[in-house]
Regions:
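Terminal, low-structured helical/coil segments at or just beyond the last alpha-helical repeat
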Residues: 118, 139-174
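Register position in tetratricopeptide repeats
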Residues: 3-4, 33, 37-38, 68-69, ...
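Generic helix N-cap/helix-start motif at coil->alpha-helix transitions
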Residues: 7-12, 20-30, 42-43, 51-61, ...
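Canonical positions in the second alpha-helix
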Residues: 16-17, 47-51, 78-82, 111-113, ...
């Protein structure tokens, strides 16, 4: 029913199944994804958050959906208990940037390095952006030097241009 886009019918069946089989992870996942298909991010995240009490591996997915829903503090709270360090740190970096907590994001550098996440071009650019945002330009430049991806290289070039503007005309960068 979900695949045929008969969402209400699917929701009715899955909600009943969830009440009858509250421990069934598959029912919870199907229900959450049906809500996702309808753009009901908070409902989907809440269901996965409850399912994560039985299977902690679902914690990252619930946190990600809360992040996409704009509930960054809730996402950050769930993120704290994710076991997979790579998933945890990559997600935390994106949440901190969304919250404009650039200092905290920049302070993740050693953790990102230790877990090998700085090999990921998107993570490296995100870290450079955080460093730029707190005016640590030399460190931001160091990370921008490693970008090879064409789109990220273009963004890095623009960030470098903005750094020059901020150095010469600091009043434009408040």
């Amino acid at each position: 029913l979900r695949l045929s886009r008969e969402f209400q019918e699917a929701l009715n069946i899955l909600e009943v199944a969830r009440l009858q089989f509250p421990q069934d992870e598959m029912v919870a996942k199907l229900l959450a994804h049906t809500y996702l298909d309808q753009g009901k991010l908070n409902s989907a995240a809440f269901i996965l958050e409850q399912a994560a009490l039985l299977n902690p591996k679902l914690q990252a997915e619930a946190a990600e959906i809360y992040r996409r829903a704009g509930r960054f503090h809730k996402a950050l709270t769930l993120n704290e208990s994710i076991d997979d360090q790579k998933v945890k740190f990559k997600q935390r970096l994106s949440i901190l940037l969304a919250l404009k907590q650039y200092e905290r994001a920049a302070n993740m550098e050693s953790s990102l390095y230790r877990t090998g996440l700085l090999e990921d071009q998107d993570v490296r650019y995100a870290l450079a952006y955080a460093l730029f945002s707190i005016r640590r330009y030399p460190e931001a430049n160091k990370h921008l030097d490693h970008l090879k991806n064409a789109e990220l290289f273009r963004k890095g070039t623009e960030l470098r241009r903005l750094m020059e503007v901020c150095k010469t005309e600091p009043w434009q960068c408040t």
